[in-house]
Amino acid sequence: MNYRKTLIACYLGFVTQAITANFAPLLFLTFHNVYNIPLGKIALISSVFFITQLIVDILCAKFADRIGYRRCVVGSQLFSAAGLLGLAFLPQIMPDPFMGIIISTIVYAVGSGLTEVLVSPIVESCPFEHKEAAMSLLHSFYCWGSVGVILLSTVLFS
């Protein structure tokens, strides 16, 4: 059986995780200037992201075996996409833009938490000849995703 597509999907999952973790902080000054959100409240966005991710990490360990790893990983990408889409629209349509940002953050943090907990064990369980290399490359994709989102954002924001 060929696990190449599984490996590529896992690599892309870590890129998605990097986007969810790094995109909103690049917008903090935009949130402050456009929506007049105080910087003290903006600092809560990262806290909400990581607390949500931690809660998902804890809960995921209990439920992934019952629900299934594939469903959970596909769900992680759907949550991440929905949260990022929400970040584009919810602050503009909700009466309180900050609540739109927080709701979006919680949604994409769920996806990020699922990715964090599930992707490494999936790659580890695949019968690759050079598993150590696959795992090293997997974790480098988070870095590449971070670099990509920062470079692309820099180009688009300038």
Residue ranges and their predicted role:
Residues 78-95:
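C-terminal ends and interior cores of transmembrane alpha-helices
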Residues 97-114:
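Hydrophobic core of transmembrane alpha-helices in multi-pass small-molecule transporters
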Residues 5-37, 57-60, 120:
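Extracytoplasmic
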